[in-house]
Each structure stands twice: as structure tokens, then as C-alpha cells.
């Protein structure tokens, strides 16, 4: 059962009849992503019994194929992950540091060291249950066989066409013929990226940052004029750290630690931060998953700016990220759980620029503390994209009161697996 937009989970009715392909009986969880194809992948993972961590990993690799302007394999980011059984919440951080300097400062270009694959590898080890290959395969299929260009990617292409048009490899990937870029609804095939994702699927994430593929990637970036080295890839690690936490009655609110934007989200949640407005800038993407056991994962990944370094590494299909730690402050997922039962009460992400962390905190405050309907709170956001699931009585305690929603502009999508 696919449920889009903002709704009460109790309002779900089966869109597919029993005994028909695609029918899902019972509640399996909910997902939100900034791009619809990725949300569909996350929903399918949950419907097949996967965990919230599995769904988040699969959505990231799907996004790498469908929204490379914000979430390519060249990205970095941060996730918050909660286990209901142990009542523990942790932050998995994988900021993308600058790679080495270009060999020729006049003709070369600077890139960030890609860390998102390393981050997803760690997330899967700690919070996954499904086989790694089955999660990566969804993104591989979207790249190899093609997927319809979403409104989200079409918007980014319209804003960034002139920026990426200066790179021959990028022009080739986005060109649908006669120098015209793919647009909304066009089926978009990326064979090089499909091959890269197949390598990650078969050899595991470790090959991307310290194996044979890592060496190939570093060599290809250097041949194109960048400064990425094998040492850069091996040294840019993902880590498990303590998130920021704040008491909310009998609950705990969890925020991403610095250098990410958690402090800004925390301030807005407390009522002392910025508003919900601001222009959309792009370059980041948020996604979240909550499974039927009450486990939750919320992530934000980013490219440093829209389309990152605006360079695609030939032969890999990877849009490289741009260096610059300032973009970390724009990434800020959030969770709220009950410290006695471990039940999840809220999961949220935001993307789209400097105002995104404050927008997330404000929507969380309005829905959880002021009991504003989620649809109303999301409708007031101007610029950033906020995705959220909020359960006033807790997901396991009373999921029928949960609300789930993506931005009302139609760029992202919220889906529920089951009823």
C-alpha cells in the first residue's frame, strides 16, 4: 500500500487487493525521502521485512542514481539511528573532507573526499539485517535500466545546467540528445554509475574506500584534473559519536552533533531559533525510515553545494562533491524517543540550504509540542524541504495517530508500507 503526502497512518487502505502482486498486509513502517523513486525503494525494503537501517541504506543508493545533484556517491553526511529494544540512539557521522590539491592549479579542480558509502557501510553493520547486496541493487537497477527524472532532479537541473554544462562528462550523462538535458518524466539511464554500483554490491562498501575500486577512482579523478588520492579515501572515516540530546518531558530529543546543524535545530525546537522560510539552495538531501519495531534512522547527505564540484569522474558516473566544511551546518536530522520504553515519537530531516535546520526544528516544535497538524506545519515552510513522521502517543503505543509527510511542493514523497 503506497501512501503519499501527509496523512494519518490509520487512514491507509489497501490500494492492491489481497492475493495480488504488491499486496502488503499489516504495518511494516514508513519512509520519507526528497525524491520519489528513493522513497519507493525504502518502502519496498520495509515491506519485505527490512529494518529502518536497511531502508535508509537502500534509499541512499537509490538517491545516488536519481538525485546526484544532492546525494551522489561523492557525498558526505550524518545519520541518527535509534534502536527501540535497547533504547539507544547514536549519531553516525561521515563529513567529506577536502581531498588533496589539484596537480595543476590552473586547469585542475578541487573535490571533497567521498564518505557516504563508508557511512552507509557503518550504518548497515550496526543497524541493518538484510544482505548488503540486496540494498545496493535497487540503486544499481535505477541507474542501469533507467528511472524517470523526478520533479526534484528536474528543478536542480534547471538551476544548475550552466554549472555542470562546462564538464564534458557531466554533459554526456545528462544529455538526452542534441545537447538537450533530460527533463521531468524522461527515462534516464546511467550505465557507468550502474557498473560502479554493481561493484559496490558485489565487493561491498569497503572496496569503494580502500580496495581496488578506490584506487581506480583516485586515478580517474587525478587523470581528470582533481587531487583525490587513495590515502584520502582510506583516511576519511565514518564514526559513531554521541548525538546532542535534550529532555522533552519523559522523552529525549536527539540532534546531530557539530559540525553539523544540530545546535540550530535544537534552538528552533526550543523556540529560540530562526523561522521556517528561506530560499532553496540545493546540494543536500534528507531521508528517514521507521520500522514496525519502533527503530528509526534519519539521515542528511550533501555535496557541498548544488551538484558538488560540478565534475563527473569519467568511467564511474560519480558526480564529485565540493570541498568546504560550511555545508555541514546545513545537515541536521532529528529524532525523539521515550527514554523509558524506547518508542519513537518523531523522526525528521530537512534539506535545501542554510535555513533547513531551523525549519526542521520549528516544524518539530509545532507538531509535537503545540500539537499542530503536520500538514499545516509543512505548508508554512517556504524554501527548505522538511520530511517528518510524528507519533503523539508513540509508534508502538498507538500508530493510528501517527502522521507522516514530505514537503507539499511535490518534490519529496512519504510512503507507508502496510496499513
Feature-to-residue mapping (PLM):
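Accessory "access/gating" subregions that flank catalytic or transport cores
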Residues: 30, 46, 161-258
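Cofactor-centric catalytic regions
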Residues: 385-419
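C-terminal motif of bacterial Sec signal peptides marking the signal peptidase cleavage site
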Residues: 9-11
Amino acid at each position: 500500500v503506497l501512501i503519499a503526502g501527509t496523512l494519518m497512518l490509520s487512514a491507509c487502505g489497501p490500494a492492491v487487493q489481497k492475493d495480488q502482486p504488491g499486496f502488503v498486509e499489516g504495518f511494516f513502517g514508513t519512509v520519507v525521502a526528497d525524491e520519489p523513486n528513493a522513497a519507493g525503494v525504502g518502502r519496498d525494503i520495509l515491506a519485505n521485512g527490512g529494518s529502518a537501517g536497511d531502508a535508509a541504506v537502500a534509499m541512499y543508493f537509490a538517491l545516488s542514481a536519481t538525485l546526484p545533484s544532492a546525494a551522489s556517491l561523492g557525498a558526505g553526511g550524518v545519520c541518527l539511528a535509534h534502536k527501540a529494544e535497547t533504547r539507544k540512539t547514536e549519531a553516525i557521522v561521515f563529513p567529506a573532507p577536502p581531498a588533496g590539491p589539484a596537480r595543476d592549479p590552473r586547469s585542475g579542480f578541487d573535490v571533497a573526499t567521498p564518505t557516504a558509502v563508508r557511512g552507509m557501510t557503518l550504518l548497515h553493520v550496526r543497524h541493518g539485517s538484510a544482505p548488503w547486496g540486496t540494498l545496493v541493487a535497487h540503486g544499481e537497477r535505477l541507474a542501469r535500466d533507467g528511472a524517470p527524472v523526478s520533479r526534484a532532479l528536474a528543478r536542480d537541473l534547471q538551476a544548475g545546467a550552466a554549472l555542470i554544462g562546462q564538464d564534458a562528462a557531466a554533459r554526456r550523462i545528462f544529455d538526452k540528445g542534441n545537447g538537450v538535458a533530460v527533463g521531468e518524466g524522461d527515462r534516464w539511464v546511467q550505465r557507468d554509475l550502474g557498473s560502479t554500483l554493481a561493484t559496490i554490491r558485489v565487493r561491498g562498501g569497503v572496496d569503494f574506500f580502500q580496495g581496488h575500486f578506490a584506487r581506480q577512482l583516485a586515478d580517474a579523478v587525478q587523470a581528470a584534473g582533481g587531487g583525490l588520492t587513495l590515502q584520502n579515501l582510506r583516511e576519511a572515516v565514518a564514526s559513531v559519536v554521541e548525538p546532542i540530546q535534550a529532555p522533552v518531558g519523559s522523552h529525549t530529543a536527539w540532534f546531530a552533533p557539530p559540525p553539523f546543524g544540530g545546535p540550530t535545530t535544537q534552538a528552533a525546537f526550543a523556540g529560540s531559533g530562526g523561522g521556517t522560510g528561506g530560499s532553496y539552495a540545493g546540494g543536500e538531501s534528507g531521508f528517514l525510515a521507521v520500522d514496525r519495531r519502533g527503530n528509526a534512522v534519519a539521515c542528511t547527505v550533501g555535496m557541498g553545494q548544488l551538484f558538488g564540484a560540478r565534475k563527473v569522474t569519467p568511467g564511474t558516473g560519480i558526480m564529485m562533491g565540493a570541498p568546504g566544511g560550511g555545508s555541514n551546518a546545513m545537515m541536521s536530522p532529528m529524532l525523539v524517543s521515550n527514554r523509558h520504553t524506547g518508542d519513537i515519537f518523531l523522526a525528521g530531516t530537512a534539506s535545501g540550504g542554510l535555513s533547513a535546520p531551523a525549519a526542521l526544528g520549528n516544524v518539530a516544535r509545532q507538531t509535537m509540542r503545540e500539537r499542530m497538524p503536520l500538514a499545516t506545519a509543512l505548508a508554512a515552510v517556504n524554501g527548505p524541504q522538511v520530511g517528518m513522521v510524528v507519533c503523539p502517543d508513540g509508534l508502538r503505543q498507538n500508530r493510528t495517530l501517527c502522521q507522516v509527510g514530505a514537503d507539499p511542493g511535490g518534490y519529496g514523497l512519504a510512503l507507508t508500507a502496510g496499513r
